[in-house]
């Protein structure tokens, strides 16, 4: 995000692109947002803090070196002066994962880190299926036109899996073609939309009968809880 000669970055795994951006634009790095502790999201943090004396917002606990502003669930803060964000806990991928939501931009935006991807979700490295379901349900409550900026470009593989779960879902087939065309032009598939995810993302659709039936067929057992469905789908994706 940039405004009036200043900018903020999310999850700088490497400081080099930030240095290059500053060199090319002359903009001042004012703030950094960190979603979770994994190295590919924090690798450039200490170098950038040291070089540019900027603020860094991220999960509380003191386990991420370089964070200057520790955030709790539902805490609000401002970026670049004008943009009001809410940090909310989104466990599953990691226990400390935060997502950042802003509705003071022209269109609502979400920085989802590695919890929610276009067409998928993050691996359960620390959390449980119940944790991830909690996070998916939080995302569902956001405005449908919310732009989702996630941590990785995994969209094509995610949609391939989503199609395996729901082969007759026309929205998934449509998304596959759109993303294929976009990526063929060497453009990012991101951002996605909450509205899109509700139609195509199996981890957002764990209460849909088609997803439940697919999970039961894969696991060869009756699934009585939605978290069980998500857990089976996640295990399926891990081995897909």
Model-derived regions: residue spans:
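Short beta-strand-to-turn element immediately C-terminal to the catalytic PLP-Schiff-base lysine
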Residues: 1-2, 101-103, 162
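Residue-level signal for inorganic ion chemistry
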Residues: 11, 48, 114, 152, ...
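Active-site HxH/HxHxD metal-binding segment of metal-dependent hydrolases
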Residues: 7, 14-89, 108, 174, ...
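Active-site-adjacent loop/tail segments of enzyme domains
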Residues: 120-146
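Accessory terminal helices/loops
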Residues: 137-147, 156-240
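Active-site metal-binding loops of divalent metal-dependent hydrolases
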Residues: 12-14, 37, 61-62, 93-94, ...
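Ligand/cofactor pocket segment of small-molecule handling proteins
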Residues: 76, 82-89, 94-129
């Amino acid at each position: 995000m940039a405004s009036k000669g200043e900018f903020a970055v999310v999850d700088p795994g490497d400081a080099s692109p930030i240095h290059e951006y500053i060199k090319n634009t002359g903009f001042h790095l004012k703030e950094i947002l960190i979603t979770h502790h994994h190295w590919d999201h924090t690798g450039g943090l200490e170098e950038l803090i040291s070089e540019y004396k900027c603020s860094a917002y991220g999960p509380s606990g003191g386990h991420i070196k370089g964070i200057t502003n520790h955030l709790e669930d539902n805490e609000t803060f401002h970026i670049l002066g004008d943009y009001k964000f809410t940090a909310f806990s989104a466990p599953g991928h990691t226990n400390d994962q935060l997502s950042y939501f802003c509705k003071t931009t022209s269109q609502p935006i979400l920085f989802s880190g590695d919890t929610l991807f276009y067409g998928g979700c993050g691996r359960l490295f620390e959390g449980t299926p119940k944790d991830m379901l909690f996070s998916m349900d939080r995302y569902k409550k956001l405005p449908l036109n919310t732009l989702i900026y996630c941590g990785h470009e995994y969209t094509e593989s995610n949609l391939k899996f989503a199609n395996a779960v729901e082969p007759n879902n026309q929205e998934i087939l449509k998304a596959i073609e759109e993303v294929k065309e976009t990526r063929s032009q060497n453009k990012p598939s991101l951002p996605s939309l909450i509205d899109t995810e509700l139609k195509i993302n199996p981890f957002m659709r764990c209460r849909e009968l088609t997803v439940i039936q697919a999970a039961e067929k894969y696991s060869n057992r009756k699934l009585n809880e939605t978290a069980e469905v998500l857990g089976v789908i996640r295990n399926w994706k891990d081995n897909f």
